[in-house]
Design a protein with these regions (language model features):
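Non-heme di-metal
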Residues: 1-330
């Protein structure tokens, strides 16, 4: 089997895990923003959030829609061109489509809460660097060039690893954690539920993209060493951007149930985990005690059956299997 050799027939699948673990799980978890009531969040925004809390939430939400547009384009425009296997193509197309659901949902949250200054937000240095990083990690080879050229495979491998591990697996996680933490105080339930579904989507996308990189390394063993330096440098850059972003959103102080210090060390831990998922050793030291105070978020990202910490009924990865009536929750 070779990842870059075009197969005419739809089946048999040569890489069935991208159907069963990628496409199928995403299809089972499909959701829309219209499923989530927001009236309670509007009341919280107008009556129950402090100025510091509103500053944090507003800064995060304004950046979400823009970043998701870049992510969607990568799956549908790049991955489908590189890997001419239907099981991978249909997974990438569905992942890209789900990112448009995220972008629409985040825009809906912004509109609902009256957050409309997208242009001003994009001029913030901490935000602009995030957007730039998302759009720069790409490569314009096609599958025929990848089959023949080790240079092409190195460039695409680096791009795929950086995108999957750090863009999908790290870059928005500090924001997800902050927004979901409000449910500790029974606030912003609609936003919290959207974060829950978004995190599970992004965790799946990151997992499958990292797996695709490892498949490349299995078939072309020289790739892992060739790409290592660039991937470690990208990890450092991603972490620096996240730490700067955390400073920006916490510039008016910590939240009641979440500190900037704890979140920063959780992000160190998170990026180490993604390096391991790519097949590399952890690279960053961190305060284990501080990162452990966000263990509740690890459960959210895992996508496995668990009892939710914030009075939401037990869930599994598949939203369709949750059997929940959201009107009961809200």
């Amino acid at each position: 089997m070779k990842l870059f050799e075009k197969r005419i027939a739809y089946k048999p699948f040569e890489y069935p895990e991208y159907y069963t673990e990628g496409w199928l799980k995403q299809a089972q978890a499909f959701w829309l923003h219209t499923e989530i009531p927001m009236s309670g969040d509007v009341k919280d925004w107008n009556e129950n959030l402090t100025p510091a809390e509103k500053h944090v939430v507003g800064n995060i939400l304004l950046g979400f829609a823009q970043t998701e547009c870049a992510v969607s384009d990568y799956w549908t425009g790049m991955v489908t061109k590189w890997f001419p296997k239907y099981e991978i193509i249909q997974m990438a197309m569905l992942f890209g489509a789900q990112e448009t659901v995220h972008a629409t949902a985040y825009s809906y949250l912004n509109d609902t809460l009256g957050l409309t200054d997208y242009e001003g937000f994009m001029h913030e240095p901490a935000i602009a660097s995030r957007i730039d990083a998302l759009t720069e990690v790409r490569s314009d080879y096609d599958h025929e060039q990848l089959a023949k050229s080790s240079t092409a495979r190195r460039d695409v491998g680096k791009s795929l690893a950086i995108f999957s591990a750090f863009t999908e697996g790290v870059a928005l996680y500090s924001s997800f954690a902050v927004l979901y933490s409000f449910q500790l105080n029974n606030k912003l339930k609609g936003i919290g539920q959207q974060m829950k579904w978004s995190v599970r989507d992004e965790a799946l996308h990151s997992k499958m993209g990292c797996q695709l990189f490892r498949h490349m390394c299995d078939e072309y063993p020289e790739l892992k060493a060739d790409a290592k330096t660039a991937i470690i440098e990208a990890a450092k850059l991603t972490l620096d951007m996240e730490l700067n972003f955390i400073d920006k959103i916490f510039e008016k102080g910590d939240l009641e149930n979440l500190t900037a210090y704890d979140l920063k060390h959780f992000m160190h831990k998170r990026i180490n985990e993604k390096l391991k998922e790519l097949g590399y050793e952890p690279h960053f030291a961190y305060d284990v005690s501080a990162s452990s105070r966000l263990d509740w978020f690890e459960h959210l990202a895992s996508g496995v059956e668990h009892a939710d910490f914030f009075s939401i009924r037990p869930t599994s990865y598949s939203k369709a299997n949750e059997g929940e009536d959201w009107s009961d929750i809200f």
